[in-house]
Swiss-Prot record:
GO cellular component: cytoplasm
Underlying gene: grpE
InterPro entries: GrpE, GrpE_coiled_coil, GrpE_head
Quaternary structure (record): Homodimer.
Organism from which the protein derives: Natronomonas pharaonis (strain ATCC 35678 / DSM 2160 / CIP 103997 / JCM 8858 / NBRC 14720 / NCIMB 2260 / Gabara) (Halobacterium pharaonis)
Subcellular location: Cytoplasm
Protein name (database record): Protein GrpE
One Pfam family it belongs to: GrpE
Main location as per UniProt: cytoplasm
Record family assignment: Belongs to the GrpE family.
GO biological processes: protein folding
Region annotation Disordered: where it falls in the sequence: 1-44, 135-157, 193-217
Length: 217
């Protein structure tokens, strides 16, 4: 046999040997069985891999929890930001409305004074119509009048005391309303101007006592 023929036979034998030990032979094996076989043959290596996988899974869970926590915080911060912005817009709208209403109240005062001055009938009719329209606008904005009756306890938050006068009303109560006040959404826009009673004068009390004595006789 020649050298070339000998080499060919040897190469063929090696190819057959490689084919018999090819990895493709194990491709169809059950993965679980393969792991079981590895665990049986090299338990320490498989155990180490399991520990590493558990640690990696724990790290991933921690990272996931951290991301979820951060996301929830960001969502809460955004919701709080939206609420603050909405409250700020509401305050700005309320301030703008209050400023407009205060100007309208000044116009109302002027119209009221015009009505009290016995204007001509033609003018009075127009003023009264404008007065009613203005009151409708104020009502639509939720504006309410502050008009305390005589004898009402004074409230420094709602009443502006012009002076104290002698009257038959109890001491410290409203004697007379001079100009109505107004409030909107629970906030006083303008306090009512009032006089406060000091109680009846000494002469009045003496007269009352005298009348009582005369009645007894």
């Amino acid at each position: 046999m020649s050298d070339d023929q000998g080499d060919a036979v040897e190469a063929s034998s090696e190819a057959d040997e490689e084919a018999s030990t090819s990895p493709d032979e194990g491709d169809d094996r059950d993965p679980v069985a393969a792991v079981a076989e590895r665990a049986e043959n090299d338990p320490a290596s498989v155990a180490a891999e399991l520990v590493a996988l558990r640690e990696e899974a724990a790290e991933l869970e921690t990272e996931r929890d951290d991301l979820e926590s951060r996301l929830k915080r960001k969502q809460a911060e955004f919701q709080n930001y939206k609420k603050r912005q909405e409250k700020q817009r509401e305050k700005e709208r309320a301030r703008a409305t209050e400023a407009l209403v205060e100007k309208l109240l000044e116009v109302r005062d002027n119209l009221n004074r015009a009505l009290e001055q016995d204007a001509d009938a033609d003018i009075r009719e127009g003023v009264e119509a404008t007065f009613r329209q203005l009151d409708d606008i104020l009502d639509g904005e939720g504006v309410e009048a502050i008009e305390p009756d005589p004898g009402t306890e004074t409230d420094p938050k709602r009443h502006e005391v012009l002076l104290q006068v002698e009257s038959d009303e109890p001491e410290g109560t409203v004697a007379e309303l001079h100009r109505p006040g107004y409030e909107m959404a629970g906030k006083v826009l303008r306090a009512a101007q009032v006089t406060v009673s000091e109680g009846p004068s000494g002469d009045s009390e003496a007269e009352d006592d005298a009348d009582g004595e005369d009645g007894d006789e």
